[in-house]
């Protein structure tokens, strides 16, 4: 810095990484570089990733569901399925909250009544068939066959693209609290 020289990334300069990412010029395209890294990994050759993974805390899995026939199951998606018009104005990306919508008495989710507002994928197929995100039709079949006790009367939805970890954890805490209070002991979580 004192010499007013360009400061390069930590992997070149040897300082502790700060988490900042910089645009860099490379002779090879990203596709070529990642293919070379993948081949090195597959052939057990030494390699260095360009984007190291952050360490995340370990989350213990939920207890095993012993008897599905006595279980109320909730449905949740990060695919952004909402009633047409997005009445709660959920964000298409970088979500800070989630929606909770009644499915009480419904056997299916109809095209034109629900739509996906997710900003990270082509939502055409999900909007044309909402069961791709919330499989209510199949769950009602399982309920009618006695294979599960019931489907929870609401489904939950948000858009998972770009949501930060702390916000996700807070939403998860609120959801878990709501589900426990409602007697729900299992959930099906779909993602895109």
Describe each PLM feature range:
Residues 1-192:
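An N-terminal assembly and electron-transfer interface module characteristic of large anaerobic redox
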